[in-house]
């Protein structure tokens, strides 16, 4: 017999309501948008009913993971739960990063530790369970990549076909995941907004369950807030910094913090700080302008593809979370974000995708403006694993040295300290260094100061010659240019052993006879003679 969670009178313990017009909507009618005004829906609970069923001792003492919060999810049949043991992700206290940034009590919630490497798994737990409750024949989802992989994985566990629509050019790591889980994946020539619109049409036409950044996903993802409170010894932090794309995760976290506050599990609420890249920042822009609506970004352009949602579905919910909590919004450049990604990896050995590094990049301006204080407890949401989009990190990393297999080559690598070469950080890679032909002494000094490499006279001479060639052709030298030149000179200077060398050749021709040719070569140290006619 199915384990029903309805109230004694048979009524559900939750309802779906439109956040704009307030209309109550049956989930069999829609669980995505209001059928009247097409605005997002929200799940409203009977919290007295939840209180009456809640085992507070078990909640406080059982291990941290998403499944322990089943009482807070809108699930009706617990026999149908689709789970991959998501949640229970680590909350790291980052002492080295704290020292560098000046935020003394800095924590990272590493959501990359979820089964598919991203926070989306929490929402997929609820969404795929709802799909099974509703007897879905298939699932359809639009995604910038992370949700595609997560929904595909959970659909596979649930035994449901999964149709995925992603914008063309989605990170290959994310597509590889989704395809490996059995997704029927289509790339759409357009933006995420185009893919999301098309997914809705496909679901309506073919009767598929539409997954995505909708009301039920919010309910699963709010477990991040529950875990943060537990992991901080049942205290809420002063501030939580959240990367935003569609705004769903910001809405989910805020809802989770409010629920634990209202149920008496914590005595305060955090300030919610939303962060976005400057190539796609519609929610923060609306916040900063004091607007009631979110204006869409027609063509997002950012390295943070996971949050490149130009027309955010839950933008209004995210705005409400930031304003209700007394929080704020920050916009960061791609260059600053990639720098933050490297900083987190170097200092704390946490490798996140670019979107997960936006909170790290935002710490400096937040401190400068007084939006966070040095002595406050601050939690940064690291939303996804860096292996989701490894190519992004390579944009600011140096090309590895390539050498011949000799100890002399290794000695040269160590002597020249080639491991010290750092890629021109994206934020200053375009900074001009030379607009006129410099002296060799100036080039050597600049390479040492900018790239950390002390060149020998021979290498300095070659680098100077190439720099001069660039400048004479009217091309000023930036830091990124200098790095490229130095790397290529050092590669070209690597010891090469000739494999094949032509020593001599002789060709004989005549008016009526065939041409005769003879060639003498050295191949791998052995002299070889060859003849041919034709």
PLM-predicted stretches and their roles:
Residues 2-425:
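PLP-dependent amino-acid enzyme catalytic core
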Residues 421, 425-534:
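Terminal or standalone catalytic/regulatory effector modules within metabolic enzymes
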